[in-house]
Regions:
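Conserved, well-structured core segments
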Residues: 2-5, 9-19, 84, 105-108, ...
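Exposed substrate/partner-binding surface patches
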Residues: 33-35, 117-252
């Protein structure tokens, strides 16, 4: 665990990277320098930042990721959007995050069912109220919804039920929400165990991260730019300013 300097509001970059650097996928890759794609400047910069604990590579990283919506090194941005952007630029990271999903649509008239398949790298949760347990928020996410203005191509009936389905489960499961959710260190979905390794937070003007190394048993750390502090072993980082939760699949 190491700190990163804040350059003109780059706390959102720091929070995203400090969270990702606890991910086993990144740890394994950057522990073996020969795996780095020398033709990919994003990969090269991340490896430099990781191996040299932030003393090199950060300013170069700003330049290679900078866009109109990712003002790295110039202004505050969004940690979640940066993680999504990194998945777009790094195929191996995208592979770890991406999963198959789809919408099951059933006509309210003729009852014909169709499934529209796609893939995603995150789950955007919009819970019905603040502070509900993560599993309840997921249940709301996959609960069938009535769509009144949908028109059936077969019978022309107006109205259907739509339900989100998961086709596969990724190595890294990312949830994001602007509403506080009561999360836990262990999440079991469809018999699969996921362990929380990072919580990225935002209070309206500043980003920071809680992170731990895996497997479970390692201490949690607060990573706030250059301020890095180990938490008490009996404490769990529950924070109502959470925006991004990163879980890793435990495979026996």
């Amino acid at each position: 665990m190491f700190g990163l300097h804040n350059h003109r509001g780059s706390c959102w970059v720091n929070a995203a990277l400090q969270g990702l650097f606890s991910c086993p996928v990144l740890v394994d890759r950057y522990s073996e320098r020969e795996e780095v794609d020398k033709e990919n400047p994003v990969d090269v910069c991340l490896e430099s930042i990781y191996r040299n604990q932030g003393t090199t590579g950060l300013r170069e990283f700003f330049e290679v990721i900078k866009t109109t919506y990712l003002p790295a090194g110039e202004n505050i941005g969004d940690s979640h959007e940066l993680i999504v952007h990194l998945c777009d630029k790094l195929s191996w990271l995208d592979k770890a995050f991406r999963f198959e999903t789809g919408d099951r649509i059933e006509c309210g008239g003729c009852k014909v069912v169709q499934v529209e398949k796609t893939t995603a790298i995150d789950v955007n949760l919009v819970p019905s109220r603040a502070g509900i347990p993560l599993l309840d928020a997921i249940h709301e996410y996959v609960r069938p919804q009535t769509i009144s203005d949908w028109k059936c191509d077969k019978c022309s009936h107006l109205g259907c039920t739509k339900q989100v389905l998961f086709g596969t489960f990724p190595k890294v499961l990312m949830f994001w929400s602007t509403t506080p959710i009561d999360y836990s260190s262990l999440l079991v979905l469809n018999g699969k165990k996921y362990f929380l390794f990072s919580v990225v937070c935002f209070n309206g003007g500043h980003w920071w991260t809680y992170a731990r190394k895996l497997p479970p048993g390692h201490a949690w750390y607060v990573l706030d730019d250059m301020n890095v502090r180990e938490m008490d072993s009996k404490k769990f980082p529950v924070d109502r300013t959470m925006r991004v939760l990163l879980y890793f699949l435990y495979e026996n």
